[in-house]
Amino acid sequence: MFLKALASALVALSVAACGPAGRTELIPVEGDASMGPADAKVTLVEYGSPTCPGCKAWHDNYWEELKRDYITPGKIKFVFREFAIHGAIDAGIFAVARCAGKDEFYAVIDEAFLRQDALVQASLKGDAISELNALGDKFRISADQVKSCINDRAIIRRINDVRSDAQGKGINSTPTFVLN
C-alpha cells in the first residue's frame, strides 16, 4: 500500500517539478550521497533541504519506512541531492554533512532535520555558525573543522552545481523527487 501511495506521489511531484519537456532526466552526479545498491533497478532522488518544512514533514513521516522497506532490503537506491533552497544555512549544513564523510552523511542530515527550528532561528539571528558548530560537534567535527568545511571550495562548488543543475531541469522547490 505504501509503495503505491509513494509511487503516485513521486510521479506527481516529479511531473510537477519538470521543465517544459515534462521529463527530468536522472543522471548520476559525481559525489552523490546514496544508500542502497549501486546497481538497483529503481533509483529515487530527492532534491532536499534540512531547513525546508515540507522536507522535514516528509522525513519525519516517511523516511524510516522507506529505509526499512525499500533501501535496506536492496529494492531501491536512494540519492539525496543537496538543494540549498535557504542559502547559507543549508550550504553550511551540507558542508558539515560532507565533512562528516560518506558513512555519516545521512546521520548529519537526519540530525539537522531534528534541529531544524534551532538552525533556522540561529540563521535568522545571524548566528548560524553556533548551531553549525553544535551540529558538527555531535559528529566529532571541531569548530575549526566546521569553518574549514564551510569554506571548502569543492564543497561549495558541488552545492552550487547541484542547485544549477536542478534549476536547469525546472526543479525550483523542495522536496522534489525524481524516480527513474
Give each language-model segment a name.
Residues F2-H86, N160-R163, Q167:
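Extracytoplasmic thiol/disulfide redox context detector
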Residues I85-T174, V178-N180:
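Cysteine-centric redox/oxidoreductase cores and disulfide-bonded domains
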